[in-house]
């Protein structure tokens, strides 16, 4: 082990080497040939992507619902086929019982109509009924997966409504719970446990108070065994809540809710499109985006779906015109129901895995995925939504070459200064951010596949009735669409010299990142020595060894993956990632206490994308290292090095113990 002074010297030497390598690469040409990038950028139409989005938002696209199947069959599939693409629909069961990974599939939901009215107010004489919600006017005002029914009852404010404490001394039996919590949790407490007949959900006072007229997206998500006991719910705006509270101060307020909907077995509908590879068609570059979300919901994620449709058309058109040669590998587009559809897909295609030796593919090898680009909220007008575009870097548990490629193509896109004829001239300042969770790239990362998410954050319209087509921008569609399409094209067409160039650039990026971590480690050692800092340094030295062989192997994890028998045994993951919250149901009280303490210790510091790792993310990454060949000592070191946190072996052992009891890992 090096002394502190030696560590500082090593750090400076390493950092100097990183800067030298980076300066050499900075003067080189971009990874995507400029003529190829220009062909893609010139063909890709931001207006066409926006028009695709405009068509998609006409449908109430809820997972497992007939309208989700309808938008796939009536919009996405025919447009792909009209562009000359090979395309098909695939469906999986979704009934509130079938599990994919740790997620229970949603029930099918056929929604037809719904209304909520103020029926009477004791403090007002001769009150005329006041409409609070009509599905035809604001589709998001009906809680998704609401059970059909007709009820009237007195409103009772139960605060958040998600905890038994909210109902102490409060009688909601036969009444309607007025709450600010998540509808699924409110229904389970208020309706199933305490006898309420329905729920009305209002926004918390801290939730975007500058926009009191918005209605938030919310859902009930009943399981099959809850079908007889569940009920329906509505969302109202903050302004409507304030009006109701004013009336309730004068006396009892009764509301009347009526919903025409059916809950039962459904189907998760996926759309596939392919541009087949000519040399290794079994190796896929995967582009994904979720097609679901309520009617109107434009940026989330009709925008990603519309942008993907235009990306597929763009490449097919350029190939047909012989402006681009067909790709060597298959480019596979999948429009999915978020999480549930992706988990169903990988559960039913167990052959899917990372391609491994990606730069020297063997002919006629097994089907595999080289990389995944996930498009989720990509069309924002950044001024109207007060947001910025980003892509997520991959975590340390998967090969890191995708970070370098995406960074380089992003810079190339910035230099192109792209706009659409009917779009804005908004200043574009995109960025690369650390891995953040919350979309379908999580599932592929759990398979070991390098995966990135393209999106926007923050966005004040997210999951609200204000996420409409007028908040999209054809210029943003063109920029992000060209960026994603060019990156995918490189992955599907790169020859050995191009891969060598990417590996060299990735090597320099990795050296620079590890030097940054070592600089932080040296600061910790100087100011406040800790066990985590020592692990960080040890892991840095170990990863430095990996880097010496990376120029030959292509990624820092290859040595372990290719020769697992050389390494110690360790915990082995037994389930798909990410974990649903239900995965920890039934844990002993002592373990639940520890989990709660860790959630508080690693709490998110943002309502949007977290700027520091939270407990769910750290758990995800820890489990992704659990390959049966990585010891808990190594996992603690890897996590400490990645997040610059003091995570010791005892912490990992405790996590493994809990996961083992839940049959999520094997010790």
Residue ranges and their predicted role:
Residues 30-32, 46, 54-173:
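Noncatalytic luminal/extracellular "stalk/propeptide" segments of secretory-pathway proteins
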Residues 31-67, 377, 630, 634-642:
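N-terminal capping segment at the start of a domain
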Residues 36-44, 57-68, 103-105, 142-146, ...:
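Second-shell loop/turn segments in exported
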Residues 44, 133, 233-234, 241-242, ...:
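Metal-dependent peptidase/peptidase-like ectodomains
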Residues 64-67, 71-74, 130-232, 296, ...:
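Extracellular/luminal Protease-associated
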Residues 134-165, 220-299, 310-313, 317-326:
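Soluble metallo-hydrolase cores and metallopeptidase-like ectodomains found primarily
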Residues 314-345, 375:
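Short helix-loop-beta-strand segments that form the rim/entrance of peptidase-like active sites
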Residues 329, 460-512, 627-630, 649-667:
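His/Asp/Glu-rich mid-to-C-terminal helical/loop segments that flank catalytic regions of hydrolases
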């Amino acid at each position: 082990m090096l002394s502190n002074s030696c560590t500082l010297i090593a750090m400076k030497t390493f950092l100097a080497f990183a800067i030298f390598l980076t300066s050499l690469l900075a003067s080189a040409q971009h990874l995507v040939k400029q003529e190829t990038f220009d062909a893609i950028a010139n063909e890709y139409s931001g207006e066409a992507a926006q028009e695709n989005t405009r068509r998609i938002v006409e449908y109430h696209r809820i997972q497992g619902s007939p309208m989700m199947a309808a938008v796939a069959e009536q919009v996405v599939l025919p447009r792909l086929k009209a562009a000359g693409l090979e395309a098909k629909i695939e469906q999986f069961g979704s009934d509130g019982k079938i599990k994919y990974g740790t997620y229970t599939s949603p029930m099918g939901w056929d929604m037809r109509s719904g209304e909520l009215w103020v029926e009477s107010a004791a403090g007002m004489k001769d009150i005329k009924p006041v409409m609070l919600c009509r599905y035809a006017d604001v589709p998001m005002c009906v809680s998704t997966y609401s059970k059909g029914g007709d009820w009237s009852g007195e409103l009772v404010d139960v605060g958040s409504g998600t905890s038994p404490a909210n109902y102490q001394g409060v009688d909601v039996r036969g009444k309607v719970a007025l709450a600010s919590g998540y509808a699924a949790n409110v229904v389970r407490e208020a309706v199933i446990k305490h006898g309420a007949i329905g729920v009305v959900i209002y926004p918390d006072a801290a939730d975007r108070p500058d926009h009191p007229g918005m209605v938030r997206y919310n859902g009930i998500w009943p399981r099959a065994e809850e079908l007889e006991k569940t009920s329906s719910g509505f969302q109202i705006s903050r302004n409507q809540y304030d009006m109701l509270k004013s009336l309730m101060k004068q006396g009892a307020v009764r509301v009347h809710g009526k919903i025409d909907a059916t809950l039962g077995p459904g189907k998760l509908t996926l759309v596939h499109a392919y541009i087949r590879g000519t040399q290794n068609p079994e190796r896929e570059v995967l582009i994904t985006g979720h097609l679901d979300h309520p009617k109107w919901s434009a940026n989330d994620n009709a925008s990603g779906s519309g942008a993907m449709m235009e990306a597929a058309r763009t490449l097919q058109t350029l190939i047909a015109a012989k402006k681009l040669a067909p790709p060597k590998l298959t480019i596979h587009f999948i429009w999915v129901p978020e999480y549930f559809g992706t988990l169903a897909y990988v559960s039913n295609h167990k052959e899917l895995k990372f391609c491994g030796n990606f730069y020297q593919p063997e002919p006629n090898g097994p089907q595999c995925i080289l990389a995944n680009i996930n498009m989720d909220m990509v069309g924002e007008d950044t001024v109207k939504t007060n947001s910025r575009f980003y892509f997520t870097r991959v975590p340390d548990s998967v090969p890191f070459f995708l970070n370098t490629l995406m960074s380089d193509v992003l810079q190339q896109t910035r230099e192109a200064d792209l706009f659409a004829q009917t779009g804005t001239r908004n200043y574009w300042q995109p960025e690369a951010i650390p891995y953040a969770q919350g979309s379908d790239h999580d599932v592929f990362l759990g398979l070991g596949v390098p995966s990135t998410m393209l999106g926007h954050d923050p966005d004040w319209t997210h999951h609200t009735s204000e996420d409409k087509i007028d908040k999209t921008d054809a210029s943003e569609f063109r920029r992000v669409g060209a960026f994603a399409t060019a990156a995918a094209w490189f992955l599907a067409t790169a020859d050995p010299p191009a891969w060598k160039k990417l590996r060299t650039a990735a090597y320099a990026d990795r050296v620079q990142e590890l030097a940054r971590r070592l600089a932080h480690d040296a600061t910790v050692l100087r100011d406040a020595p800790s066990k985590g800092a020592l692990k960080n340094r040890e892991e840095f030295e170990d990863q430095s060894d990996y880097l010496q062989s990376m120029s030959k192997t292509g990624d820092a994890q290859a040595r372990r993956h290719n020769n697992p028998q050389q390494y110690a045994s360790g915990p082995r993951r037994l389930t798909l990632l990410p974990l649903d919250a239900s995965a920890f149901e039934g844990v002993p009280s002592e373990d639940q206490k520890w989990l709660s303490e860790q959630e508080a210790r690693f709490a998110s510091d943002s309502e949007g994308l977290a700027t520091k790792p939270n407990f769910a993310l750290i758990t995800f990454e820890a489990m992704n290292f659990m390959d049966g060949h990585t010891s808990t000592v190594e996992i603690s070191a890897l996590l400490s090095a990645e997040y610059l946190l003091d995570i010791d072996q005892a912490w990992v052992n405790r996590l493994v113990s809990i996961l083992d009891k839940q049959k999520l890992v094997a010790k």
